[in-house]
Structures are given as C-alpha cells and as structure tokens.
Design a protein with these regions (language model features):
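Hydrophobic residues in well-ordered beta-strands that form the structural core
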Residues: 75, 113, 138-140
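Short helix/strand-capping hinge loops at secondary-structure junctions
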Residues: 108-110, 115-116
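Short amphipathic alpha-helical segments and helix-helix/interface helices
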Residues: 23, 62-63, 101-102, 124, ...
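Short, glycine/acidic-enriched loop or turn micro-motifs at the edges of active sites
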Residues: 16, 117-118
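A contiguous active-site-proximal alpha/beta segment in oxidoreductase catalytic domains
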Residues: 118-177
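A structural signal for well-ordered alpha-helical segments within the folded catalytic domains
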Residues: 16-20, 98, 147, 184-191
Length: 191
C-alpha cells in the first residue's frame, strides 16, 4: 500500500539551474508539469570556489529554493541524508560528486546524480562500486532525452526510423571541467 505522505527528497548542490527547476516540479502543485509523490524538503548548497558556474549561482539558487519553496538549508550532505528518503545530487561541478557520495553512501538512500556523474571513468567506477557496496539504487542521466519535442519526433517519424540528425547545444568550455564532457551530453541525448 502506498503512503499518502510524499517522499522526502533531499538535494545536494544548489549551484545548478536544475536545483530550482527540479524543486519547482516537485513542490509547486500549480505547475503545469508538477510531479506528485515527492517533495524537496532539505538541501545542502555546496559550491566550488574555483568554478564560476558554481560560485556565481549558489547564493541565488539557495535563496530561491528556501524562500519560494520553503526548503530547509543545512550545512552538510550528511544532514541532507539524515533528513530525507531519497537524494538528488545536482552539484554543477562533477568533480565533487564522488566525495559527496562517499559522505552519504552509508545512509543508503536512493540517489539520482545529475550529469555528468563524474569527470573520469575511475570516479564513475568508484561511485558505482560504492552504490553496489551499500545496496543503493542509483541513476545518472541528462533529462533532455525525455524532452517532449524529442520523444514526439521519435514517435512520429514518417519513415519509421530516423536515419540522421544535426544536434547542437551549449558548448562553453570550462577550465575546471575537462573537454566537452559537461555539455556534450545535451547534444548526445538525441542518440
């Protein structure tokens, strides 16, 4: 039997535009794409001092999720894990994902790790191994693969199968994020 109580979702990382977006979708019952069943209730802002896309946005997104959606702000990933049923790790700086996950793995909370899961295959492997060790359901992907326009195009292709496409997306190289890994996921989602 399902509970009428929403799943308490904790969020780690308020330096990504996904933080207020996901919070809105889960907490705002009047939103056109509201997702019932869960609610973001607690979050740790995080942030990376050497990554402009992180430190320049963390304060504004923190204020937004706290003031607009009433989400409790805490001082550590561990406090998030203690106070929730499931976790969204949306830190924009993927360099911190492994360390953040190490800090909360023992809590055994199901987790979504926003793209990219890691910046190296060794970090990704370590995250997967930790999840397996602690029996944690974990997933990581870019949500654009589920964008309405893309899924509709795949369903309505006149020839039955798509044989080619041009993809583009944001491509600002970041000194702390190697190569195209951070942003190439968006264009690659269509494949």
């Amino acid at each position: 039997m399902m509970s009428d109580k929403p799943i308490r979702i904790g969020m780690i990382g308020l330096d990504s535009s996904h933080a207020p977006t996901f919070t809105q979708l889960l907490n705002d019952k009047n939103h056109a794409y509201y997702v019932p069943g869960g609610e973001v209730t607690v979050t740790f802002p995080g942030g990376s001092d050497d990554f402009d896309m992180s430190y320049s946005r963390v304060e504004g997104f923190t204020v937004q999720v706290r003031d607009k959606y009433g989400v409790k702000i805490v001082d550590s990933p561990e406090e998030v894990a203690e106070a929730c049923d499931a976790i969204l790790m949306v830190s924009v700086d993927a360099r911190v994902h492994l360390e953040q996950f190490r800090r909360i793995a023992a809590y055994r909370k199901p987790i979504f790790i926003d793209k990219p899961m890691a910046l190296s295959s060794s970090d990704a492997k370590a995250i997967v191994e930790l999840a397996q060790l602690h029996h944690i359901p974990m997933m990581s992907y870019s949500s654009l693969r589920y964008a309405e326009a893309l899924t509709e195009a795949l369903l309505t292709s006149e020839s039955g199968s798509i044989i080619g496409m041009d993809c583009y997306g944001p491509l600002a190289l970041q000194p702390t994020q190697p190569g195209l890994l951070v942003w190439c996921a968006y264009g690659g989602d269509a494949f």
